[in-house]
Amino acid sequence: MTEHWHIKPFLFRQVFPNFEPLCDFDTIAEMASDEDIESRLIQHSKAGWTLEHGPFDALPSMKKKAWTVLIQGIDHHLPEAYDLLQLFRFIPDARLDDVMLSLASDGGGVGPHYDSYDVFLLQMHGKRRWKIGPLPNKELEEGMPLKILKNFEPTEEFVLEPGDMLYLPPNYGHDGVAEGTCSTLSIGFRAPTQAEVLSCILRDMADQIDQDPGMTQTLFSDPARGLQKNPAEIPDDLLNFGFNLIRQFSAKSPQIQRSMGILLTEPKTHVYFVNNTDDQEIHEIISVLGERGVALSMKTKMLFKDADFYINGDAVNPTSALTVKQLQMLANQREMEPIDAVEALKNPEFQYFLIGFAKAGWVETLM
């Protein structure tokens, strides 16, 4: 980690010996046809590059050269991909993003490009030739539907076979081309931008002012206002009204932490949960969860900091040390064996939270 993470590439040969594909062509085609799953079709010819967004009624024939379909977030839909992602939890969950699948015909790829985040490229089926290199120049081709590097000069080249994996740090150039039909898994890591963080913090601050009865909406006022010499000039006291508001929240780290927790667990656009509002059915589900164990949904993102918890964009604040311990177990293990679930459900506060999670569709039975 200290030598390569965020610093330089590393090639793992046969990190997964005898690696078996997580799914077949029919499953990939089915995911590409699902409107709730993000997919893209990229094709390359003498005329240039084309990009189409799914869902797709059908994929091109594998006999046709130089096309690639990308399926985002397959760990939300395939238990095998979900289990694979768990192997990468040596990095904090807050940084884990998802598993993307790339199926390509001979010659297929997405062109020379770079990612702004760390990525592991795991070969699932067939062979892919990777050309990689540092980027002294990030200039992109103009008029392209994809972000393709204009002057990419690779310094290394590898052919990956099933079970091989290539790690690339952020902003490192790479170009992968299929040699025959192949499929590759990309395990990506989230890197929120400053704009995302600031936007979420400010939005959450505004929500807190609206919802917290202890925080009253204060309008700007200027009872001592004198005559304005320059009518178009913004008054200093009005600017200070804004500055002081930001300072007020900046001094309250728990509120900043809350905003970050919400941002880091907020579901993506294509992630949906099925709500359950039938109280009788919910109590039956809770009973079953006690008997069969509890597991977070494959789509659920749950994080915590000390005694504060964040799940799928919501903040959860338990009051008892026991509940904190039980929720930390659920977040860290992403599941509870029946023996632990039965014991935890004896705690009314934990049961209260679990009922809320079950209603939102965020948990399911373990067995």
Language-model-detected regions and their locations in the chain:
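Long, charge-rich, low-complexity alpha-helical segments
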Residues: I7, P318-M367
